[in-house]
């Protein structure tokens, strides 16, 4: 589940992170109860909240977090940056983990926002099992749609919706056509402007994701003061 950037929007429906980030980039506990850093800043102890279950009813434990960290290290495409400073992590009992870092990191909790997956989940698993507010249900053979149901045991309260269906398309044009015709109620992941379509409401919101634009100041293009 950590390999594909295109699935990121679904992660937040099926999975939870140990911490969440606010608009001011401060970390708030989610699956984690607390994180206590060591004096050297290169180690720390994490406690997991009690009473949290996966959508299949199995309890969340420290082994699940340990498995997730190691899985991301092996498949770093999307969340590799969150774990690259982790030298080692060990589980102690059902609710405690010890982290050793390569370098001191003052706000290490802000890195612990990746989705936690169930330990020993087969990579070939068709439908994800997470602690999030929704659980994946039936999908068609061609993986063009996925039916999702509410997770009645969600640790932060019952979801507002009972369920919904996700439809996957391979072009922006198909996605916008489905939305404009009323077949789909929500659209994301496309650059096509559909704001002019009938009965469409456009909502804009801030995110805490960064985009980086770098300039080679030593290059010939920037050798002039006017540049």
Whereabouts are the PLM-identified features?
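Alpha-helical secondary-structure segments
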Residues: 62-68, 162-163, 210-227
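N-terminal lobe/hinge region of extracytoplasmic solute-binding protein
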Residues: 1-39, 70, 129
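Ligand-site clamp/hinge motif
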Residues: 152-195
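Surface-exposed binding/hinge segments that line
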Residues: 36, 40, 81-121, 135
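Aromatic- and charge-enriched surface segment that lines or borders ligand/interaction sites
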Residues: 33-76
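Gly/Pro-rich hinge or "lid" segments in bacterial periplasmic/extracellular proteins
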Residues: 105-163, 173-174
């Amino acid at each position: 589940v950590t390999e594909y950037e295109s699935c990121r929007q679904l992660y937040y429906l099926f999975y939870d992170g140990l911490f969440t980030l606010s608009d001011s980039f401060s970390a708030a506990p989610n699956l984690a109860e607390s994180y206590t850093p060591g004096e050297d800043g290169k180690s720390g102890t994490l406690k997991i909240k009690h009473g949290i279950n996966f959508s299949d009813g199995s309890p969340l434990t420290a082994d699940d977090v340990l498995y997730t960290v190691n899985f991301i290290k092996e498949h770093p495409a999307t969340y590799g940056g969150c774990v690259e400073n982790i030298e080692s992590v060990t589980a102690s009992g059902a609710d405690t983990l010890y982290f050793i870092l390569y370098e001191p990191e003052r706000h290490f909790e802000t890195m612990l926002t990746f989705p936690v997956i169930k330990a020993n989940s087969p990579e070939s698993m068709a439908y994800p099992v997470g602690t999030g507010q929704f659980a994946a249900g039936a999908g068609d053979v061609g993986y063009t749609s996925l039916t999702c149901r509410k997770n009645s045991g969600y640790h932060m309260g019952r979801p507002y919706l009972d369920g919904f269906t996700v439809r996957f398309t391979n072009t922006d044009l198909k996605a916008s056509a489905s939305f404009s015709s009323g077949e789909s109620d929500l659209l994301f992941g496309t650059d096509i402007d559909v704001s002019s379509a009938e009965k469409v409401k456009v909502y804009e919101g801030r995110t805490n994701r960064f985009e980086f634009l770098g300039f080679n100041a030593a290059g010939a293009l920037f050798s002039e003061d006017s540049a």
